[in-house]
Amino acid sequence: IVGGVEAVPGVWPYQAALFIIDMYFCGGSLI
C-alpha cells in the first residue's frame, strides 16, 4: 500500500525493513 492506495505489483520494487534481534518493527518503500 502506497499513500493509502494499493500498489500494483512491481511498481515499487525497492523496500526497506527494520529488524532488531530478528524482530520486525517497521517497513516502507523507497521512492
From Swiss-Prot:
Transmembrane segments: none annotated. InterPro entries: Peptidase_S1_PA, Peptidase_S1_PA_chymotrypsin, Trypsin_dom. One of its GO terms (biological process) is proteolysis. Its EC number is 3.4.21.1. It is an enzyme of class 3 (hydrolase). Residues 1-31 form the Peptidase S1 domain. Keywords: Hydrolase, Protease, Secreted, Serine protease. Coiled coil: none annotated. Belongs to the peptidase S1 family. This is Chymotrypsin. The lineage of its organism: Eukaryota, Metazoa, Ecdysozoa, Arthropoda, Crustacea.
